[in-house]
Amino acid sequence: MKTLKKQGGFTLVEIAIVLVIVGLLLAGVLKGQELIENSKIKNIAKDMDAVSASILSYRDRYRSLPADETGSTIVLYGWAANVGGGNNNGLIGAASVDPFGVVAGENVNAFRALRYAGFIGGNPADAAAAARPAHAAGGNMALGNTLWGLSGNVVCLNNLTGKFAGALDRLIDDGVNNTGIVRSATVAPAAAAAPAAGAYLEATTGYFLCKQL
């Protein structure tokens, strides 16, 4: 007479315990991702503030905005002459021009001047697009003026998701994309007028954001 063998397997209680553990692990991963994203957003905001503070400190020391000086003035500091060439008008670059589309002149040389002066890190020899500092979301920072309804000089970011752009706007300003000191859109900042009103679509990529200095 054959003896029936007891088949091994998981009980419902064991399966339930495993599912609970998996759920807790997933929740931990998601929470970790959220913390990382929040950290990046805060770091980007701090970097924008740091650029603003650096420009003010530069102006206090040199009585001019970075790269707004003439080349003959720049060489008196012992820096490369091509870091200068500005027009001393108190503005960085040409008005209402996409700062990410400019690879020469005050827009990019301002960062080189800040590096020569020791206000920000990086190699002052880096020129053109390479002069723009990177930000924590994988894009770059740029400087311009009179953009998106913001008068005077502005610092801008590219390559943001709607989630990051919206979070930055709410952290720094009013959370509305076309009002306040922060403006944002999925088109490059290349106009004096404010961008069209629109919601921050969190899953959408390619946002630009500018903050008045």
Predicted features and spans:
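N-terminal leader/signal peptides at the extreme start of proteins
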Residues: M1-F10
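Alpha-helical membrane-interface segments at transmembrane helix boundaries
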Residues: L12-V13, Q33
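Conserved structured core elements
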Residues: I15, L19, K42-A45, V108
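Alpha-helical hydrophobic helix detector
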Residues: A16-L30
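Aliphatic-rich helix starts adjacent to a transmembrane/signal segment
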Residues: V29-A50
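Alpha-helix exit/C-cap motif
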Residues: D49, A53-T73, I120-G121
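Low-complexity, acidic interaction segments enriched in glycine
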Residues: D68-L213
